[in-house]
Amino acid sequence: MSAALFSLDGPARGAPWPAEPAPFYEPGRAGKPGRGAEPGALGEPGAAAPAMYDDESAIDFSAYIDSMAAVPTLELCHDELFADLFNSNHKAGGAGPLELLPGGPARPLGPGPAAPRLLKREPDWGDGDAPGSLLPAQVAACAQTVVSLAAAGQPTPPTSPEPPRSSPRQTPAPGPAREKSAGKRGPDRGSPEYRQRRERNNIAVRKSRDKAKRRNQEMQQKLVELSAENEKLHQRVEQLTRDLAGLRQFFKQLPSPPFLPAAGTADCR
């Protein structure tokens, strides 16, 4: 009769554990509707509670909502795990020490009756990845992201440099000072100083032109000299060629002595 009072799809009534839907099947017998109920499959709430929740863990999604509402800056991280850890560290001071029962959720130790409070089961951490070492780094990264986004939202200053402020020294001086500054532009064209400057400039231009002309004349003179020397060399080569041809003709006309071979076999070349 006790087994008929509990619904397999609804929460258990009068149970000491939290009122949440939980499967009451054993791990090895789930998904086998053909087999009949065996003794010990469904037990009384008080007697079977420790053995029923050995391989199960309850997940409370309200912790994620509370943590994101309490710490809005962590929304930029898109990391619910670190947000939940951050919220649990802030609430650890007022929650008090917790006692982990072997068959049920953690309950706070303290005077007076207290309602059972769920404790979310965290994933296993490795030896090198401790929650205490990763959480400060993540919080610092989130803070840097918030600062960078806040700075990006502010209007940027203009890149062009502002014109320098006018100082008292740069203000135009009245009277003779203004006339003096105006006189620095140059002497009058009819003044003798202007004529002297023009004459000096003309002399410098003439000297540079004369120097360029002299260089051009020197190069032309060298070109003429080299051309004449080249012509002489060509004439010398032609003279030597004619002398060689005359010597060959002379040696061909010489009579052959008796102790020398015939002229047809001997070649002066």
From Swiss-Prot:
Transmembrane segments: none annotated. Residues 191-254 form the bZIP domain. It comes from the Eukaryota. One of its GO terms (biological process) is integrated stress response signaling. SUPFAM superfamilies: Leucine zipper domain. GO terms for molecular function: DNA-binding transcription activator activity, RNA polymerase II-specific; DNA-binding transcription factor activity, RNA polymerase II-specific; identical protein binding; RNA polymerase II cis-regulatory region sequence-specific DNA binding; sequence-specific double-stranded DNA binding. Gene3D superfamilies: 1.20.5.170. The modification N-acetylserine is found at residue 2. Residues 177-201 have a biased composition (Basic and acidic residues). Residues 36-48, 97-107 have a biased composition (Low complexity). InterPro entries: bZIP (IPR004827), bZIP_sf (IPR046347), C/EBP (IPR031106), C/EBP_chordates (IPR016468). Belongs to the bZIP family. C/EBP subfamily. Binds DNA as a homodimer and as a heterodimer. Can form stable heterodimers with CEBPB. Can form stable heterodimers with CEBPA and CEBPE. Directly interacts with SPI1/PU.1; this interaction does not affect DNA-binding properties of each partner. Interacts with PRDM16. This is CCAAT/enhancer-binding protein delta. It comes from Homo sapiens (Human). The lineage of its organism: Eukaryota, Metazoa, Chordata, Craniata, Vertebrata.
